[in-house]
């Protein structure tokens, strides 16, 4: 049991006492978000309120039905019946993804994009609405949001609550879209957002009982920085919309650096040698004309990156400055 499990439990206890809750929990892969949100939570809430109507969704119908089967099987255990003696499953409605309680409660599982018309929900659970393939497609991301707004969100009954648990993928994923809507319209759903990065700002691991820091660092080394920050640190960055566009850049095919009229050197510094610390970076740029008559352009002449403590960084900066003799330092 990790500290994040205790925080999630407290969050869900508050949910059970607060009609109309809007909760988003962003967590890294393999940190038991589904175990809590799509297994324990619905079983516990139906035990407390056997009339509860739940719609459970995830990125595939197969996975959503699997969650439904797990919840149903848990409710059929004697230990569950001992704790919640006032709830039972209807014998004639016990399909894995579509079952009812004898007291009028309902559970309905659907994949993202699936039809849920004719269903009402006191609780909507959305667990990882995006697959890895969806994350590569802006169209798929947009489709998931459109499905949410036109489908599940419209099935919520007065006083109904929404729980979204997911790993972040980009600023255009469901969390990103909902937070953007929240910021642009005060009448839109206002979300309580809880983010759990795999490695905390304190440099400690979120769940040390399960994940060792060395293992997480190996995961980090195997991913691009953007994917690590999004999926594991819950901190996605913009893929586009930057002031300087990726497509503006070309590769300088010649071996020698062209003559430059002006040299700029920039520093982005950190002061730690820890493996999880940010890098310090020193880049040197030159202003030049690619061809006679062309407008001026800039070229990256040198780049240095490393984790240096302050004395090392100072020495490295002096070395780079003396070598390139820049006209400007940023």
Question: Model-derived features: where do they sit?
Answer:
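Pre-P-loop entry segment of helicase/translocase ATPase cores
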Residues: 1-22, 268
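Walker A/P-loop
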Residues: 20-41
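Conserved nucleotide-state-sensing and coupling region of NTP-binding domains
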Residues: 57-113
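Nucleic-acid-processing active sites and adjacent nucleic-acid-binding tracks
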Residues: 283-330
């Amino acid at each position: 049991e990790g500290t994040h499990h205790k925080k999630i439990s407290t969050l869900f206890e508050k949910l059970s006492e607060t009609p109309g809750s809007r909760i988003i929990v962003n967590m890294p892969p393999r940190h038991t978000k589904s175990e809590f949100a799509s297994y324990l939570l619905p079983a516990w809430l139906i035990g407390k309120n056997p009339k509860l109507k739940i719609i459970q969704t995830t990125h595939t119908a197969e996975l959503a039905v699997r969650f439904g089967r797990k919840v149903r099987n848990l409710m059929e255990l004697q230990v569950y019946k001992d704790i919640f003696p006032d709830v039972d499953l209807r014998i004639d409605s016990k399909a894995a993804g579509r079952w009812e309680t004898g007291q009028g409660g309902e559970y309905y599982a659907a994949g993202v994009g699936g039809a849920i018309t004719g269903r009402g929900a006191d609780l909507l659970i959305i667990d990882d609405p995006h697959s890895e393939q969806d994350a590569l497609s802006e169209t798929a991301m947009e489709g998931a949001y459109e499905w949410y707004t036109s489908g599940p969100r419209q099935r919520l009954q007065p006083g109904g609550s929404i729980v979204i648990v997911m790993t972040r993928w980009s600023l255009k994923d469901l969390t990103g879209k909902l937070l953007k809507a929240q910021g642009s319209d005060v009448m839109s759903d206002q979300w309580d957002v809880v983010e759990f990065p795999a490695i905390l700002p304190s440099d400690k691991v979120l769940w040390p009982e399960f994940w060792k820091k060395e293992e997480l660092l190996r995961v980090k080394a195997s991913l691009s920085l953007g994917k690590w920050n999004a999926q594991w640190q819950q901190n996605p960055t913009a893929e586009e919309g930057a002031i300087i566009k990726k497509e503006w850049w070309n590769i300088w095919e010649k071996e020698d650096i062209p003559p430059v009229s002006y040299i700029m050197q920039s520093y982005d510094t950190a002061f730690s040698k820890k493996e999880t610390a940010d890098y310090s970076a020193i880049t040197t740029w030159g202003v030049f004309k690619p061809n006679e008559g062309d407008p001026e352009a800039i070229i990256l002449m040198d780049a240095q990156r490393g984790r240096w403590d302050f004395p090392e960084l100072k020495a490295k900066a002096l070395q780079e400055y003396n070598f390139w003799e820049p006209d400007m330092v940023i």
